[in-house]
Each structure stands twice: as structure tokens, then as C-alpha cells.
């Protein structure tokens, strides 16, 4: 090889020696470039999910941020507006009716009368139940104004419970991470063991201005 001749042959000047060293270095760099894999490109901005319906609560930025925290299995799913209070009225029973026939996960989002946006992701459709249901994929979130996500701690499995007159998500010491009344007008939020969450609204008790339930499928 040419590089071996340069290494063992006496060169007439230091200039030639320096040049040979530079060429050796260039050959080594070329080999490194051939063997080093190119880094995987990272998207500059999260993708806005495909929507079937228009949200009165979340904008494109909030939806994109939330999509980054959804379980990998729902990546690429479209969001369908199954229920909204402006269209279907302020009624928990109406919400349950709109959930009939759906089995996929649900993103519940709301804005209270203070303008605060928050909600929850449920791994399955919202429904009436005798006890708590759901999986560890369930989480709570709030925009205050930056997005905060409160994932399952593993402390208990009190994910979602649907009664005729209330909907509850997360529980601990008799307090709920998020609960809504039967009229979908009043609600509350407290720290709970399920998600180790902060109070989602500005106050523990709040009044709902707009609520939406998006089915992911």
C-alpha cells in the first residue's frame, strides 16, 4: 500500500513527511465516514393529528403537544369529535350515549370559566360502570399555560369510574384527580395517588365552559 511505502522510506524533506501524514489522516477519515451510520432525522415540529371535527377548546399547538404523550399504539390515529357540549348539550348521560359503539381510547378536554384548559386521556371509551376501569395508559393533563402531563404512578388502579351523576378519574384518600357532575357544569380536581397530579384548574372547584370528547381510531 502507498501508505506503507511512505512509512518505511526515508523522505527527502520534512515537507513531504507532513504531506504524507495529512493523506493518511484523510484516508482514516474517509473510512470512518463509510462505517458511521447517519443519524436518524428528528422532526422539527410534532405533527397535528388528523381531525374529524373542529375543536372549540384546543388549538393546533395544544393538539400537537398532547399527541407526543399518547401511547405509541395510537400514533397516527385520527381524532373524531364524538361529543361536545356546544352541540350535544351539558349532560353526562348524553356523553355516555355518544360513546356507545366506541371501544377505542378517548381524549377528554375542557375549558373552565376561568379560561383554564385541562382534561384526561382514557385508554377506553367512557361509560357507566360499577367500579373503576382502564389501564396504566390513562393520564391527566393541564395547560397552565405550558402543558403538564400526569402519568400513572402505579400506586393504585383507580383510573376511570362512570356513575349516572358523576364521572371520576384518579382517586386516593377519597379525593379525585378529576371529577365532573351529571350536568357537566361543575367539576373538581384534587391531588390523587393514582397520578400524583397537581390541581388541574386554578381552583379545586370549577365551572365548565366547554367540554369535548375525542375518540381515537
UniProtKB/Swiss-Prot annotation:
Residues 19-35 have a biased composition (Acidic residues). It comes from the Eukaryota. SMART domains: TLDc. The gene is TLDC2. Residues 56-217 form the TLDc domain. Belongs to the OXR1 family. It comes from Bos taurus. Coiled coil: none annotated. One of its GO terms (biological process) is response to oxidative stress. Residues 1-48 are annotated as: Disordered. InterPro entries: TLDc_dom. One of its GO terms (cellular component) is nucleus. This is TLD domain-containing protein 2. It holds the Pfam family TLD.
Amino acid at each position: 500500500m502507498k501508505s506503507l511505502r511512505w512509512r518505511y522510506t526515508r523522505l527527502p524533506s520534512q515537507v513531504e513527511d507532513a504531506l504524507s501524514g495529512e493523506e493518511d489522516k484523510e484516508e482514516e477519515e474517509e473510512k470512518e465516514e463509510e462505517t458511521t451510520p447517519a443519524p436518524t432525522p428528528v422532526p422539527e415540529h410534532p405533527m397535528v393529528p388528523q381531525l374529524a371535527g373542529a375543536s372549540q377548546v384546543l388549538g393546533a399547538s395544544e393538539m400537537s403537544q398532547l399527541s407526543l404523550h399518547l401511547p405509541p399504539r395510537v400514533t397516527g390515529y385520527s381524532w373524531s369529535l364524538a361529543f361536545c357540549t356546544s352541540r350535544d348539550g351539558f349532560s353526562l348521560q348524553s356523553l355516555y350515549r355518544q360513546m356507545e359503539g366506541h371501544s377505542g381510547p378517548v381524549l377528554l378536554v375542557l375549558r373552565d370559566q376561568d379560561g383554564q384548559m385541562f382534561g384526561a386521556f382514557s385508554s377506553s371509551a367512557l361509560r357507566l360502570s360499577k367500579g373503576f376501569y382502564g389501564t396504566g395508559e390513562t393520564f391527566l393533563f393541564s395547560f397552565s399555560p405550558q402543558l403538564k402531563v400526569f402519568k400513572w404512578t402505579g400506586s393504585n388502579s383507580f383510573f376511570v369510574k362512570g356513575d349516572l351523576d358523576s364521572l371520576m378519574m384518579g382517586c386516593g384518600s377519597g379525593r379525585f384527580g378529576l371529577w365532573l357532575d351529571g350536568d357537566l357544569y361543575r367539576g373538581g380536581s384534587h391531588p390523587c395517588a393514582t397520578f400524583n397530579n397537581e390541581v388541574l384548574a386554578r381552583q379545586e372547584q370549577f365551572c365548565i365552559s366547554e367540554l369535548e370528547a375525542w375518540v381515537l381510531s
